[in-house]
Amino acid sequence: MWSFKAELEATCPGSIVEIDCKKLKNGQVYFRRMFVAIKACVDGFLAGCRPYLGVDSTHLTGKYNGQLAAATSIDGHNWMYPVAYGIFYKETKADWTWFWKQLKRAIGTPHGLTIHTDACKGLETAVHNVFQGDVEHRVF
């Protein structure tokens, strides 16, 4: 992961790659969550997409479990446009709040931004706490 972060930041300056780990008393480090927003995707969203984000997550299964969250928009051709993604263990209020803070850091608060999410526990509160009413939040 650290190599991925270093390579992405070197080849795509301005991209945001946040890796959050937990360090135990014995010195072991455990992965908690990750957020990625590639600069070209963020710039494309801000310059040419509707001020709309659809955000949802899906379960990861296999060797590593968790959630893969994605923020997508709609471009000028009405196609899905990827903006950012994150990986975390489960859909908790703390993990969603962390994801939204990283996303806001990446895109700011574009005028007229509408965010669509599902009715996941803690998600509505996290959006409100991070964007503080500056966006319209809809639940589908």
Q: How does the language model describe each region?
A:
Residues 1-140:
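DNA-binding interface regions
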